[in-house]
């Protein structure tokens, strides 16, 4: 009793019940309204919101409106428990509603209410079949009420996606939402952005998306490209240089071209100006070639082993197989040593579902099974799980688990149970964990001539069709545990008298939640049903947690006459299994929490860069942004040669001029007389003023729109080039720090510290290059923005049910090249097999 009084979920349940009672009280009044009067409620509510009222002020009336509209437009009236579910969702919580309780209809109430704000509502499903189905069916209701509905699918053009997102309500998959967010932060014109601000999302099967897929990153990677020729050309060029063509700092491992070196580069590559905007990428190749040839040393920093460059660990001297230098340096070394130059693929944008969905102003979710993960939902997403009561009592029979010594005996028993119940005509759904198990059981049923369907989740349309018929008399369906989520199994004629749907589990899953989902396929809306799990000591879960102990106990119950097994059916075994599942769930939660801690580092960095990118796209004039970057650069330049609070010496002035003259400023642009005998702060101010003079000079010479576009072109290209390299570098760092635990170091702390240093370097590089290019580049009349990442491919870091679609057609990879889909497999073992 006292637990209930202090339980947040219990309090929320009581709160939403009061709201449902208020909605119920309005039912008769709203039935009396004409269609026109009911439809007029939508503009009426919008006007009230514009006049300062909140969504909570109109919640009860809006729910009552949508409920009555559903009756008229869909022929379905939400029950009280569905109104309770909608109220829980509006509170930014998870409504746990059993299978068959009408989650889709429940969502319409809260979606309608929140769509009235005009800020957009996203309804999120796990696949495009469900998104299309729900948008089509529920769209009838929303359109009746005067709201617009969009469907965001993978195949749509950017224009079609933008139209879908601009609707009051948008149906989409979780994957497509995440990819669109990433792509929006790679565009080069603000008009190309498709998403609006992330306002409110209702996530169907929320446990699947926010728990099961939490560790799956969404990745947009640059497709495999053959850049060997560019690396070879850059290598050939730097090998032709003489000592006076470059300045080298062995201690800092830093090298730059001198004025003579830059002149040679322009002649070698036939360029007018090496520091022109369009040459950012080429300069990157040259810089890597310089480092490879004059900073990196064979048999010190790396060795050649079996025709490949292998890094030498600077601390242990051991070869670091499987590791690569990032940002193209490894390929530059391959060019230097004339070994095979491997194609580059790089991660150019990435985000996890954990971080994506936490960006919504408000987040809510629905599922039949969330209570077991309530702590995780609360701690990571700040969402409570509200258990919504069923409309009718659950009368399903959940039998005690039975356990066998061997897997063979278990499957024989399952086949016997299926055969016996099939003879009576009772429909049977058999849940398996793997396709392999499904095929094994299918083989056994074929031998017994029992007709059945097997689902492998490869075709959503076919899957939904089979599941929808799985409750008919005589149906036998074998499916993976997750198959058919989102589609109800309705009982056929005469099935209630046979005991309803029989669900048999072939083994226990690692997660109690998945087992509960399988059970929940039976006994919907007060229907009868029966569920039972069959286990053996050879099951994976049992092997991991003390199967030997069970084998000893089971040895006493083997039939002594014929040696056959007698299954054990004791509740103690079920409790043992549940205990094992809790341990695994705890481990998985810890793992997801750890992933989030790593992701937090990149999340903060991504927010800064994406924020800066948006400023570039949306500000009319970015001169203040550029000026701020130039100030930081000038301060750093002075600080690199002297104490900025002291007076500059002749020697320091000489060093400074060597660094800036011809590199950060046009040759001879800095007057030595203006910096001698000045304090460091004054020197930095002078350099900044010269930057401003160059800006002003460009502004006077060209029309204002051309000048503004010039700044945006340079800054976008510099930011994107370095950010994409940084993403790739952070990915490699994450792999590298895993080895730190062996050296008694905290890998997370190492990742945080090194990641912070890398980001500081990234910011400095962006500021430095922006200053260099803007000061030295010539403005052209036909300036065009150009996307840095080309031939990109979106992947979710896991095998998908449908073929991934590259954004642009690319060169066909070789059989042993990495597959461009981003799976990490060789092409011949992935998409090359199709």
Regions found by a protein language model. Give the residues of each.
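Hydrophobic, well-ordered secondary-structure elements that form the walls
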Residues: 430, 478, 723, 759, ...
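Generic detector of ordered secondary-structure context
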Residues: 22, 58, 278, 325, ...
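Glycine-centered loop/turn positions within well-structured domains
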Residues: 216, 428, 723, 817, ...
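Positions in alpha-helical segments
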Residues: 24-28, 596, 757, 817
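Active-site-adjacent structural elements in folded domains
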Residues: 107, 414, 804-806, 814
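Conserved P-loop NTPase motor core
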Residues: 1-561, 610-611, 627-628, 632, ...
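Short Cys/His-rich zinc-binding micro-motifs
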Residues: 809-828, 832
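Extended, charged helical/alpha-beta scaffold domains that provide interaction surfaces
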Residues: 303-310, 316-323, 525-526, 533, ...
